[in-house]
Amino acid sequence: KEALVIWGELPTLELPVEREVWEQWWADYWQVSWIPEWDFVSTPPWLKLWYTLTKEPLAKEDVYYVDGACNRNSREGKAGYITQYGKQRVEKLENTTNQQ
């Protein structure tokens, strides 16, 4: 907010959602008393997909539990997954960080 005050001009932010969807969400979940001006732009297909994801796992479909880590000094690590049906895979990683 300090940068906005220093420059003396508030930017108009682009929100990739339809106005009606945003206003409904804002009415239910608002947490601040002030937000800058918004321009509502067309929603990319991947963002529409995100909002249509299911909340619970589908019956008889694999649920993947994913994890990974690496050693900070050697930069060697492992990443993998396991499903509720026991299918699993682990890969060794070299020259990596925990951010990748």
Swiss-Prot record:
Protein task: During replicative cycle of retroviruses, the reverse-transcribed viral DNA is integrated into the host chromosome by the viral integrase enzyme. RNase H activity is associated with the reverse transcriptase.
Keywords of this entry: Aspartyl protease, DNA integration, DNA recombination, Endonuclease, Eukaryotic host gene expression shutoff by virus, Eukaryotic host translation shutoff by virus, Host gene expression shutoff by virus, Host-virus interaction, Hydrolase, Multifunctional enzyme, Nuclease, Nucleotidyltransferase, Protease, RNA-directed DNA polymerase, Transferase
Source domain of life: Viruses
Similarity section: Belongs to the retroviral Pol polyprotein family.
Gene Ontology biological process terms from the UniProt entry: DNA integration; DNA recombination; proteolysis; symbiont-mediated suppression of host gene expression
Keyword Hydrolase: yes
Other remarks in the entry: This is an African green monkey isolate.
Limits of the RNase H type-1 domain: 58-100
Protein name per the record: Pol polyprotein
GO terms assigned for molecular function: aspartic-type endopeptidase activity; nucleic acid binding; RNA-directed DNA polymerase activity; RNA-DNA hybrid ribonuclease activity
